[in-house]
C-alpha cells in the first residue's frame, strides 16, 4: 500500500481525484491496482504536504512539504504600523528548512524564525519584488504588479499533495486597463517545485503581456549567480547568500511555454514574458533549495536540478486506466 489521498481539485465540495506517487525511469511502465481497503494495511496518512492561512501573523498564507516551505502576504501586513508592517508585495517568500520535519506551525508559534534554532529559518528577502516567483503585467516596457492577495483558501492537505487558491484584486496597469489574478498552487511530497496556474481577468483589453519572474538583483539577496535559458521553455535560476553564516539559497522559475523574446530584467527582477488572454490560465513552476539541507551545494548543481525538473514537465507521464 503506497501513500495516497482523495482530493477535491475543483473546489466544488466533492472528491474527484485519487492522488498517489511512484518513481519511473524513462521509457518504463508500471501497473497499479485499486483494491478494497478492508483487506489491506492502512497507508501512511500524515499531512506531509500542508498549507494554511496564518491569521495570527498578519494574514500570511504558508505552505510546505518534506523539503521546502514558502509564504505569501495578505492584506493585514500591508497596513501601516502598528497594525501591520506596510509591506505591499505579491512575491513569494522562501523558508530554509531541514528535510522531513514540518515547520510552519512551529515557526509561527515560536515567532523567532529569522534565526536557525535547528529546524531552519527565514533569511530570504522578498520586499516589493517577485521573490521566488510572481506575476507582473507589462505595459510600455514597465512591470505593474498587484498588491497583496485579497482572499485565500486552502483546498486540501495530505501525504501526497497540498493545494490552495489565492486571488489578487484588480490593479491598474495604465491606459484604462485593469487586471486581477486567480492563482492556484500545488506542491507534491518530495518536490522542491510548486506548480502554479495563473488566470488573469482583464478589463479594458483583450490581452496583456504577462511576466512570470523572480528576484535576481543584487539589492535584496546578494546573488552570486543568475542563469537564464529559453530553450524548450523558459528557465531561470539564481544562487544567493542572503546572510554570511547561514548558507546559500537557490531559487528557480520554470515556464513550460515559449517566452516572447529573451528574459527581461526590470527593477531587480527577471521575467519571462507571454501574451495572456482574459480567463485563459497558464502554468509555471517555482522552486527553492537550501544548501545546508540538500545535496545541491553549488549553483551548477542547482541549475542541473532545475533543468531535470524542466525535462519532467516537458515529458509528463501517460496514464491509462483499465
PLM-predicted stretches and their roles:
Residues 1-51, 87:
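Alpha-mannosidase-like glycoside hydrolase catalytic domains involved in N-glycan trimming
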Residues 1-17, 172-176, 220-237, 254-259:
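Solvent-exposed beta-strand/loop surfaces of large extracellular or lumenal domains
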Residues 181-183, 187, 192-227:
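Acidic (Asp/Glu-rich), glycine- and aromatic
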Residues 13-24, 251-322:
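Beta-strand-rich recognition/accessory modules
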Residues 38-143:
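Solvent-exposed N-terminal domain segments of exported/luminal and surface proteins
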Residues 33, 51-53, 74, 87-88, ...:
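Sequence-level preference for short, compositionally simple segments enriched
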Residues 105-190:
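Extended, loop-rich substrate-binding clefts of extracytoplasmic carbohydrate-active enzymes
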Residues 30-40, 164-168, 212, 280-293, ...:
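Short, hydrophobic/aromatic-enriched beta-strand segments in well-ordered soluble domains
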Amino acid at each position: 500500500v503506497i501513500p495516497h489521498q482523495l482530493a477535491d481539485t475543483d473546489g466544488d465540495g466533492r472528491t474527484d481525484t485519487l492522488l498517489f506517487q511512484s518513481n519511473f525511469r524513462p521509457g518504463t511502465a508500471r501497473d497499479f491496482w485499486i483494491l478494497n481497503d478492508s483487506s489491506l494495511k492502512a497507508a501512511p496518512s500524515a499531512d506531509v504536504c500542508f498549507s494554511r492561512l496564518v491569521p495570527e501573523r498578519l494574514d500570511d498564507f504558508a505552505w510546505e512539504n518534506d523539503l521546502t516551505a514558502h509564504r505569501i502576504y495578505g492584506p493585514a501586513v500591508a497596513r501601516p504600523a502598528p497594525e501591520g508592517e506596510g509591506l505591499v508585495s505579491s512575491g513569494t517568500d522562501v523558508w530554509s528548512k531541514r528535510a522531513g520535519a514540518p515547520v510552519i506551525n512551529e515557526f509561527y508559534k515560536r515567532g523567532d524564525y529569522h534565526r536557525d534554532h535547528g529546524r531552519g529559518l527565514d533569511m530570504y528577502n522578498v520586499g516589493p519584488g517577485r521573490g521566488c516567483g510572481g506575476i507582473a503585467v507589462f505595459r510600455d516596457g514597465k512591470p505593474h504588479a498587484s498588491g497583496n492577495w485579497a482572499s485565500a483558501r486552502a483546498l486540501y492537505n495530505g501525504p501526497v499533495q497540498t493545494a490552495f487558491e489565492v486571488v489578487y484584486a484588480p490593479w491598474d496597469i495604465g491606459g484604462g486597463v485593469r487586471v486581477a489574478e486567480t492563482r492556484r498552487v500545488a506542491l507534491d511530497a518530495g518536490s522542491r517545485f510548486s506548480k502554479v496556474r495563473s488566470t488573469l481577468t482583464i478589463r479594458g483589453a483583450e490581452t496583456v503581456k504577462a511576466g512570470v519572474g523572480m528576484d535576481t538583483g543584487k539589492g535584496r539577496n546578494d546573488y552570486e549567480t543568475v542563469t537564464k535559458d529559453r530553450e524548450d521553455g523558459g528557465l531561470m535560476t539564481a544562487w544567493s547568500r542572503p546572510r554570511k553564516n547561514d548558507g546559500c539559497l537557490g531559487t528557480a522559475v520554470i515556464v513550460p511555454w515559449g517566452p516572447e523574446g529573451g528574459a527581461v530584467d526590470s527593477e531587480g527582477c527577471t521575467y519571462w514574458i507571454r501574451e495572456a488572454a482574459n480567463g485563459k490560465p497558464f502554468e509555471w513552476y517555482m522552486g527553492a533549495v537550501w544548501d545546508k539541507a540538500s545535496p545541491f551545494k553549488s549553483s551548477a548543481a542547482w541549475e542541473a536540478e532545475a533543468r531535470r525538473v524542466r525535462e519532467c514537465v516537458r515529458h509528463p507521464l501517460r496514464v491509462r486506466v483499465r
